[in-house]
Amino acid sequence: MSTLRVLHEKSELGKTTVYPKEYAPHLLLPIPRDLNRKTLNVNVSEPPPFYGYDLWNAYELSWLNEKGKPFAARGEFIIPATSSHLIESKSFKLYLNSFNNERFADAAAVSQTMKRDLSKRVNESVTVNFILHETEIPVAYSPKGSLLDVLDIAIDTYSPDPNLLSTSQETVTETLYSHLLKSNCPVTGQPDWGSIEIHYTGPKIDHVQLLKYIISYRNHEEFHEACVERFFMDILRHCRPQELTVQARYTRRGGLDINPYRSTNPTFSVQNHRSFRQ
């Protein structure tokens, strides 16, 4: 069964929204990661050829204490890339809103409930953090590397074409980034805007051709997580780096932003540095 068919049958995307009045964990819609990975010719009977996570920031998160007083926080959810499922974004939004009128002893009780529900849906332990005070909010940052967007190019390709990628014989270690990433929701067609950062060691990637490849996603319809995995696999196969990390930070929609990270390196630390567009 295709990803689109699963979504059309089960998702609230593109449908009239009815917001829950009470705690509703059943609203969470898990989607098998294998559905997309098969289209990338990834052997789904083995562990994926990358490590990483999907980091979600939730900006519309609230609940009641035992006296009925509302509390608000920013939520940070880290789902391992090795999990069997991802969570469909609108179902996540509705699930979070189901906490609005629920009473809890404290923030820890809320986060523990969310961790339990999410971990059950994706079949792996999900990390849940709450940011409760302004002093905990990370400042915006700029990647330490070369901005591709300053390059003057001509392009008329707006669907992913890995054949655009090319390399030279020189071996380098460098970080490249762009704010020109745009893809689209596969169900509603809504645009997804983001910034992408690529760090690698290997044959030097042609910067002009890489920017063209990034822009070629402009009319492509695929989820955030799937787009980043497509980026990763295309660069890995066509450019043959010894080391590769691809991460994207998408702008928020419905009070959520999604930030997938994929790497050949099994040792990494989760960094939630917000881009200036977030």
Curated annotation (Swiss-Prot):
The keyword Zinc-finger does not apply. Its EC number is 1.7.1.13. One of its GO terms (biological process) is tRNA modification. The active site is at C185, D192. SUPFAM superfamilies: Tetrahydrobiopterin biosynthesis enzymes-like. Catalyzes the NADPH-dependent reduction of 7-cyano-7-deazaguanine (preQ0) to 7-aminomethyl-7-deazaguanine (preQ1). Belongs to the GTP cyclohydrolase I family. QueF type 2 subfamily. This is NADPH-dependent 7-cyano-7-deazaguanine reductase. The gene is queF.
